């Protein structure tokens, strides 16, 4: 998955190439303009002295002026060809970028179906200014902590909280607010009530305890990012203060390799079922999360016997409250039996680049514009632009050039006049 690095390496020389070609075009433009100025002066002198000189002189001067005009026209045509080459160069790089994006998207979809849509939406949200609700959510702990000022010790309680911790809380609060928007009012109340008893009984005094699976379980709409964040909060709540982290990338990798086995339920529910199936899916996720948390603490049952029993009772109450939001639990079983693997044939077919059907067609091959192309100098040519390979050219022609159809038509007209 080094598409970005490869593409950046590929376009590393593009600015220099464009600068050189634009410089060459500028020089040619100045050359054409100077030639046109000189020709205009010669034409004015020719008409001033035409009556004073002999017809032979007039014909000679007229032929010389016409020759210089044709040379200036060839230089202008060459400048246009250079502009077309620059356009094709940039267009090739744009098409290559689209191809690499399509491959990267397919690679992400193969691992987690629907993840690209979530990432694109998250990127758009990051590009836009943050909402006032999210800002209030992200910094809701700061004013409270600042008021806890101890005049005797002359320091605040936030001095020991790392800066990364606030950033992680802001990220998780954004996920929480997005998840709450996608859920309905009834299930949101049940989820928050049920899961508040079991998500963070390990260390409820920590600031991260306000984020739990109930607040993040928005169904399949939040996707893998939401569940990865939920698992990260659960994992970091049990760590020491100095080892806590909420890295979304690490959480997502841990989420993929964990024993939750969520691939089938999460990916297929977004496409096949509605609200009831997503609620039933989150019931299964909460049960798995609480059971895995209980298994991880089985080695120290003797020390935390009371804590384990309270978490088991709260897990059962959470399961019952979450189950009331779904119409049937059999939907989850049907989802788990379905597969989310992208077929290999579909993957290969999507890698091949398909042009826009609305893009205009050129040349005798009736294909879109690509590579180097040459234009027919016949103003009435129905095709106008041709690929070099289709008309047997390897370099830009000098002077005027006519396509095979126009050449044949001109020959036919010439034979008729004879």
UniProtKB/Swiss-Prot annotation:
Q: Low complexity composition bias: which ranges? A: 305-325
Zinc among keywords: yes
Q: Does Transcription regulation count among this protein's keywords?
A: yes
- What keywords appear on the UniProt entry? Acetylation, Chromatin regulator, Disease variant, Growth regulation, Isopeptide bond, Metal-binding, Nucleus, Transcription, Transcription regulation, Ubl conjugation, Zinc, Zinc-finger
Write down the SUPFAM superfamilies for this protein, in alphabetical order: FYVE/PHD zinc finger (SSF57903)
Tissue-level expression? Expressed in brain, heart, kidney, liver, lung, ovaries, placenta, prostate, skeletal muscle, small intestine, spleen, testis and thymus.
A GO BP entry is: regulation of cell cycle
Region described as Disordered: spans on this chain: 127-165, 286-325
Pfam families, alphabetized: ING (PF12998)
**Residues reported to bind Zn(2+) 2:** 376, 381, 403, 406
Q: Which residues carry this modification: N6-acetyllysine?
A: 181, 264
Look up the domain of life of the source: Eukaryota
Q: Where is this cross-link: Glycyl lysine isopeptide (Lys-Gly) (interchain with G-Cter in SUMO2)?
A: 148, 165, 167, 256
> How far does the signal peptide extend, from start to end residue?
none
Residue spans annotated as Zn fingers (PHD-type) read: 360-409
Q: Which GO terms describe its cellular component?
A: NuA4 histone acetyltransferase complex; nucleoplasm; nucleosome; nucleus; piccolo histone acetyltransferase complex; Swr1 complex
Cite the record's Basic and acidic residues compositional bias ranges: 156-165
> What's a single GO MF annotation on this record?
histone H3K4me3 reader activity
Listed transmembrane segments? none
Which residues does the annotation list for site: Histone H3K4me3 binding? 362, 373, 377, 385
Primary role: Component of the NuA4 histone acetyltransferase (HAT) complex which is involved in transcriptional activation of select genes principally by acetylation of nucleosomal histones H4 and H2A. This modification may both alter nucleosome - DNA interactions and promote interaction of the modified histones with other proteins which positively regulate transcription.
Q: What is known of its domains?
A: The PHD-type zinc finger mediates the binding to H3K4me3.
Per its record, how is this protein called by name?
Inhibitor of growth protein 3
Gene it is expressed from: ING3
């Amino acid at each position: 998955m080094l598409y970005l690095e490869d593409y950046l390496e590929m376009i590393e020389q593009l600015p220099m190439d464009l600068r050189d070609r634009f410089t060459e075009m500028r020089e040619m433009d100045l050359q054409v303009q100077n030639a046109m100025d000189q020709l205009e002066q010669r034409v004015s002198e020719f008409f001033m002295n035409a009556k004073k000189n002999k017809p032979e002189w007039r014909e000679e001067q007229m032929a010389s002026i016409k020759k210089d005009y044709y040379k200036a026209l060839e230089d202008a045509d060459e400048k246009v060809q250079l502009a077309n080459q620059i356009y094709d160069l940039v267009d090739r790089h744009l098409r290559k970028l689209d191809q690499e994006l399509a491959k990267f998207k397919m690679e992400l979809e193969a691992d987690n179906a629907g993840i690209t849509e979530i990432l694109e939406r998250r990127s758009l949200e990051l590009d836009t200014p943050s909402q006032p609700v999210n800002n209030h959510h992200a910094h809701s702990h700061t004013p409270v902590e600042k008021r806890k000022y101890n005049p005797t010790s002359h320091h605040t309680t936030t001095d020991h909280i790392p800066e990364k911790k606030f950033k992680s809380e802001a990220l998780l609060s954004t996920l929480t607010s997005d998840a709450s928007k996608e859920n309905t009012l009834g299930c949101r109340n049940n989820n928050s009530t049920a899961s508040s008893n079991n998500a963070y009984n390990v260390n409820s005094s920590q600031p991260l305890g306000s984020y739990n699976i109930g607040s993040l379980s928005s169904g399949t709409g939040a996707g893998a990012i939401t569940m990865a964040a939920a698992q990260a909060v659960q994992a970091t709540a049990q760590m020491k203060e100095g080892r806590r982290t909420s890295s979304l990338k690490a959480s997502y990798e841990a989420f993929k390799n964990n024993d939750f086995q969520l691939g089938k339920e999460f990916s297929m529910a977004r496409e096949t079922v509605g609200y009831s199936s997503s609620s039933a899916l989150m019931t299964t996720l909460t049960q798995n999360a609480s059971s895995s948390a209980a298994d991880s603490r089985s080695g120290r049952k003797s020390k935390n016997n009371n804590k384990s029993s309270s978490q088991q009772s709260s897990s059962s109450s959470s399961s019952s409250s979450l189950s009331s939001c779904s119409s049937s639990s059999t939907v989850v079983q049907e989802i788990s039996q379905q597969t989310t693997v992208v077929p290999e044939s579909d993957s290969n077919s999507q890698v091949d680049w398909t042009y826009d059907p609305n893009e205009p067609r050129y040349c005798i091959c009736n294909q879109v514009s690509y590579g180097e192309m040459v234009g027919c100098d016949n103003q009435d040519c129905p095709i106008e632009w041709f690929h070099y390979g289709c008309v047997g050219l390897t370099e830009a022609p000098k002077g005027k050039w006519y396509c095979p159809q126009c050449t044949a038509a001109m020959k036919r007209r010439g034979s008729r006049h004879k």
